[in-house]
Amino acid sequence: MSMACDDGRVPVPTLTPDESLGLVIHPRNDPTPVVEKLTSWARSHGKHVIADARDHARLPDGVERVSEAELVERAGALISLGGDGTMLGALRLVANRPVPVMGVNLGHLGFLVEVQPQELDAALDRLNTGNFTIEEHSAAVLTDESDELVAFNDIALASVPGEGSVQAVLTVMGRASGRYRCDALVIATPIGSTAYSYAAGGPLVSPMLDAVVISPVAPISGISRPAVISGAEPLALALLEDSGRPALQVDGTIRRRMAPGESLEVRLRPRAGLVVRLDPERHQRRSEVKLSLLDLPFLPEEMRDLLPRREAPALIPAT
C-alpha cells in the first residue's frame, strides 16, 4: 500500500491498483450475504478479492482462492468477517507484514470490530480512498521450539485438571522478580487486558501504552497480584521442577503441553497490528458500554429483556 498522511499522525496506507482485498472469515458463521456485498462493491470499483483456499466451500463466486502465503503477499488490506476472534486471527496472519485490517461484526460483544454489515459499502469507500485512521496494536511474541508464536490478546500457561498447579519464576531484564503458584498465568497485551487477564482481576491498559500485564489466576502462594511491565523489558517465565504440565495457549488456542523445567521468553512487538478505525470516538464509546456490561450478571443479549418496552408509534397515513 502507498502511504498517506493523516493530519501528521500515523501514516494511513491506501490501496494501490495492483493490490487485492484479502478476506478472512469466521470458521462457522455463514458469511455469504456479506461476501456477496463485498464482491459486488469490488466489481464496481475494479478491485480483486482473495481468500484462503481452505475456505473454498464457503466462498461464493467472485472470490479467488489462494494459498495462505499468497494471501499474505498480495493483500493490501484484510477484511475480517466475524467477531474479535476472527479479527485476532487476521492480525496474526499479517503480523510479519502488517497491513490495515478492517473488522466487520458478525458476532456479539467485541472490542476490535467496528463496522456493521449494513455499513460495509461506505466503509469500503473510505478504505479505498484512505479516509480512515490507523489504531496500532502491539503483539506478544515468543519463540517456541524454533517457531515464532504471535499473540495479540494473550499468552497463557493454564493448568490441566489432575496435573498440578502452574509453578514458575518470573524474570525481568535477566533478574528474578518473583515466584508464582496458581491455576494459570496470563501474559496480556494492552488490547488483551480486556479479555482473560481482566477476568482474572488484571487492570485495563490503554492500547497507546507499550506494556504487558501478567495476571495469576487463582493464586495459591507467591505473587498474588497482577503486574504491569514495560514492553521494553524482556521477560521470561521458567517452570519449576515441581510444577504441573500446563497447556500453552496463544490467543485462546492450545499449542502444546509444557514440561517442568521449561522456560518461555516473551517480548512485546510494537505496531505489529494495524486496525482500521472509521469513527474512533464512536468506537471508544461503544467499547466503554461493552466493558461495563462485562461486570453485570447477564449476557449482553439478555440486557434487552431488562429494558422498558415501548409501544411503537402509530404510522401516519399518507395524504
Segments predicted by a language model, with ranges:
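Short glycine-rich anion-binding loops that position phosphate/pyrophosphate groups of nucleotides
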Residues: D84-T86, L109, I191-S193
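Gly/Ser/Thr-rich active-site loops/lids in small-molecule metabolic enzymes
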Residues: S165, R175, R179-I223
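A residue-level signal for conserved active-site and pocket-lining positions in enzyme catalytic cores
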Residues: H26, I79, G83, N105, ...
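Proline-centered loop/turn at the N-terminus of a beta-strand
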Residues: H48, P98-P100
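Short Gly/Thr/Asp-enriched flexible loops that form oxyanion-binding sites at enzyme active sites
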Residues: G89-N96, S197-G201
